[in-house]
Amino acid sequence: MRAVLTVIGKDNVGIVAGVSNKLAELNINIVDVSQTIMDGYFTMMMMCDISQITKEFDEVKAELAGKGEDLQVKIHIQREEIFNAMHKL
């Protein structure tokens, strides 16, 4: 099972490390990542393997949102099938 994670906010030291460490803590593997900084704003999109999580997905979402607050960015995760359904033309 996979999920799409997005991170958006003002660029700051430690965003990638903070997000990566939190994902490892939640037993989430990063499958693919794209990251850029546009005019001082950090943007990152990750494809994640969530098949090994031990918590409910809503709890994972809440913990990642909390980590985003700590890092002063917005972190959003959603199941891949939901992401795909929302972005079909």
Curated annotation (Swiss-Prot):
Residues 4-78 form the ACT domain. It comes from the Bacteria. Disulfide bonds: none annotated. Belongs to the UPF0237 family. This is UPF0237 protein lmo0533.
